[in-house]
């Protein structure tokens, strides 16, 4: 990445960084009544205005001052790619200083989910992930996180004005097929998506959210605000590689955000080889924090498990994973009614000497877990053809 010079506009306050209370303070400092802040907030997140000059319920002088003394960034992606008949849309954003981040909008029959990035690059170094090859370039500001959701909301509003579009019916839990199957003879039927707005957010894009917890959480609060985007807390999911302090902190928050933990191995030796963070927070420590989280919140945790051909997808790996979660191998077990394993066949990343698990191995792994009382599904990936699937985001950079 070539760093770009920071301009004077880049140093102006980003309106997407501000909560409603902070916006009220800004505008009252300008001599405006507090209700003006509510108008601006509504324009940003309900009307989805892309410039203060479009906020026509404000006095012209205030619109001009907002345009001159604040900014909205990033507003427009540099590139949008589509896949899955337009139902998957990946946006590439360029941030001040030139850093690139990606977001993915996935439209389903009954929901629209946006996968959001929290960092440009990532320092975690998981060996199967494209983002990790970049290293950490920088953390995103709260507003740069929020802006990705605003982009997705605009996309949904724009698409809602078109004729009904086909979507793919979700498969039964036992069904799984490859991306090639999806393009050729996918087990899907034409349906009409009735969704016209973003319904779900997954913080599973580029970066580790808990490594920039304060900024990420400020974004969550802005996104959740019922006077704006109004995305319910239970409709948001955050994924972590296993930063234990973040898991413990999330357990104390008032908003019930869903938690997903990237596991990917049933023992410390293999997990440390795949995920360097395991050397800092080994499985016993991670499961202890997860157990405390479950006790404090009563909310289900999803364990994500990327299946790598011949690395972590053997039947003995499945049996060891079940034993780990049940408490039969070292750490005390977890309450299984609050545990869900999400199997993810690895999505190819150019230059990585890894393989995607074959279908039969995936289904065998799933069967072994289920036979041992572990709830388990296989993720049907979206956007593989445009490098928008799990583990493929690299900010438009060829790996």
Swiss-Prot record:
Spans traversing the lipid bilayer: none
GO BP terms: rRNA base methylation; tRNA methylation
GO cellular component: cytoplasm
Annotated catalysed reactions: adenosine(2503) in 23S rRNA + 2 reduced [2Fe-2S]-[ferredoxin] + 2 S-adenosyl-L-methionine = 2-methyladenosine(2503) in 23S rRNA + 5'-deoxyadenosine + L-methionine + 2 oxidized [2Fe-2S]-[ferredoxin] + S-adenosyl-L-homocysteine; adenosine(37) in tRNA + 2 reduced [2Fe-2S]-[ferredoxin] + 2 S-adenosyl-L-methionine = 2-methyladenosine(37) in tRNA + 5'-deoxyadenosine + L-methionine + 2 oxidized [2Fe-2S]-[ferredoxin] + S-adenosyl-L-homocysteine
Keyword Phosphoprotein belongs to the record: no
Chief site of localization: cytoplasm
Keywords: 4Fe-4S, Cytoplasm, Disulfide bond, Iron, Iron-sulfur, Metal-binding, Methyltransferase, rRNA processing, S-adenosyl-L-methionine, Transferase, tRNA processing
Catalytic machinery residues: 102, 390
Gene Ontology MF term list: 4 iron, 4 sulfur cluster binding; metal ion binding; rRNA (adenine(2503)-C2-)-methyltransferase activity; rRNA binding; tRNA (adenine(37)-C2)-methyltransferase activity; tRNA binding
Database matches in InterPro entries: Aldolase_TIM, Methyltransferase_A, RlmN_N, RNA_MTrfase_RlmN, rRNA_lsu_MTrfase_RlmN/Cfr, rSAM
Amino-acid positions noted as binding [4Fe-4S] cluster in the UniProt annotation, renumbered to this chain: 122, 126, 129
Family: Belongs to the radical SAM superfamily. RlmN family.
HAMAP family on file: RNA_methyltr_RlmN (MF_01849)
More details: Reaction proceeds by a ping-pong mechanism involving intermediate methylation of a conserved cysteine residue.
Protein name per its UniProtKB record: Probable dual-specificity RNA methyltransferase RlmN
Organism from which the protein derives: Roseiflexus castenholzii (strain DSM 13941 / HLO8)
Gene (name only): rlmN
């Amino acid at each position: 990445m070539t760093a770009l010079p920071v301009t004077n506009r880049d140093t102006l306050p980003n309106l997407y960084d501000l909560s409603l209370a902070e916006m009220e303070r800004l505008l009252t400092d300008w001599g405006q009544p507090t209700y003006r802040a509510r108008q601006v907030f509504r324009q940003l997140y309900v009307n989805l205005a892309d410039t203060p000059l479009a906020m026509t319920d404000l006095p012209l002088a205030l619109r001009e001052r907002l345009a001159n003394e604040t900014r909205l960034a990033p507003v427009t992606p540099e590139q949008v790619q589509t896949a899955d008949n337009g139902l998957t849309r990946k946006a590439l954003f360029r941030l001040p200083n030139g850093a690139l981040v990606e977001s993915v909008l996935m439209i389903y029959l009954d929901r629209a989910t946006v996968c959001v990035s929290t960092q440009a690059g990532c320092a975690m170094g998981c060996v199967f992930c494209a983002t990790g090859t970049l290293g950490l370039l920088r953390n995103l500001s709260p507003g740069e996180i929020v802006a990705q959701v605003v982009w997705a909301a605009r996309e949904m509003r724009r698409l809602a004005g078109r004729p009904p579009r086909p979507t793919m019916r979700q498969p039964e839990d036992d069904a799984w097929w490859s991306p090639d199957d999806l393009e050729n003879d996918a087990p899907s039927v034409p349906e009409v998506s009735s969704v016209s707005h973003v319904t779900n957010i997954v913080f599973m894009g580029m970066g580790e959210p808990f490594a920039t917890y304060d900024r990420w959480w400020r974004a969550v609060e802005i996104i959740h605000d019922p006077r704006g985007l109004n995305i319910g807390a239970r409709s948001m999911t955050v994924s972590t590689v296993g930063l234990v302090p973040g898991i413990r902190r999330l357990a104390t928050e008032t908003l019930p955000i869903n938690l997903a933990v990237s596991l990917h191995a049933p023992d410390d030796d293999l997990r440390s080889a795949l995920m360097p963070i395991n050397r800092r927070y080994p499985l016993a420590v991670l499961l202890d924090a997860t157990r405390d989280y479950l006790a404090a919140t009563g909310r289900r945790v999803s364990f994500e498990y990327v299946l790598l051909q011949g690395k972590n997808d053997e039947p003995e790996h499945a049996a060891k994973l079940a034993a780990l979660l049940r408490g039969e191998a070292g750490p005390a077990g977890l309450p299984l009614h609050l545990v869900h394993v999400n199997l993810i066949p690895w999505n190819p990343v150019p230059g990585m000497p890894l393989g995607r698990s074959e279908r039969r191995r995936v289904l065998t792994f799933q069967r072994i877990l289920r036979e041992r009382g572990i709830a388990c599904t296989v993720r049907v990936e979206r956007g593989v053809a445009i490098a928008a699937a799990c583990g493929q985001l690299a900010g438009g950079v060829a790996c």
